[in-house]
């Protein structure tokens, strides 16, 4: 949105605007669709820390000790991978358990969530007129 003249076209996939309600859905709401995966995700934290999954996961993810951050990263990434498709996919599950992917994915997502993607709330939607003339396609899968 900041430099629309530098963009010829948009191909969008997995649209997530990082609004508070979307973060809430990721952290808590998806338990209505994937209760088993959510239980494992939330169960990584002690019961007294489950009321604020983001803060407590983030604290672990930024801990310099691999014995602290890697289990949290793997739990976060496993949850993300398991909930990214409607039906279980062993290849996706395996990919999301790669340590390199898990740590980067979990840290980046949690960092952006904690910082509201470094933008004022709804900034992307409020400024959509800036990119309205750019051709685009949304690729979405089940």
Spans of features found by a protein language model:
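Accessory cap/linker subdomain of secreted extracellular hydrolases
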Residues: 55-96
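Generic recognition of stable, solvent-exposed alpha-helical segments in well-folded globular domains
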Residues: 52, 71, 104, 123-126
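Short beta-strand/loop motif that positions the catalytic acidic residue
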Residues: 131-132, 137-140
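Generic, well-ordered alpha-helical scaffold segments in large soluble proteins
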Residues: 2, 6, 112, 130-131
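Short, hydrophobic/amphipathic alpha-helical patches that form generic packing surfaces
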Residues: 75-85, 103-114
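Active-site nucleophile elbow and catalytic-triad environment of alpha/beta-hydrolase enzymes
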Residues: 111-128
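Secondary-structure capping and boundary motifs in well-ordered enzyme cores
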Residues: 98-105, 129-130
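A catalytic-pocket lid/entrance helix-loop region that shapes and gates access to the active site
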Residues: 2-58
């Amino acid at each position: 949105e900041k430099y629309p003249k530098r963009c010829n076209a948009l191909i969008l996939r997995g649209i997530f605007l990082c609004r508070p309600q979307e973060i809430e859905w990721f952290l808590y709401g998806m338990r209505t669709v994937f209760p088993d995966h959510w239980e494992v995700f939330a169960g990584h934290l002690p019961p007294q820390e489950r009321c604020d999954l983001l803060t407590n996961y983030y604290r672990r993810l930024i801990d310099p000790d691999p014995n602290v951050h890697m289990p949290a990263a793997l739990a976060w990434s496993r949850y993300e991978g398991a909930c990214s498709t409607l039906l279980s996919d062993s290849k996706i599950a395996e990919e999301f358990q790669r340590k390199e992917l898990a740590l980067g994915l979990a840290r980046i997502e949690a960092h952006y969530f904690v910082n509201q993607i470094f933008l004022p709330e709804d900034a992307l939607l409020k400024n959509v007129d800036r990119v309205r003339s750019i051709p685009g396609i949304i690729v979405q899968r089940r």
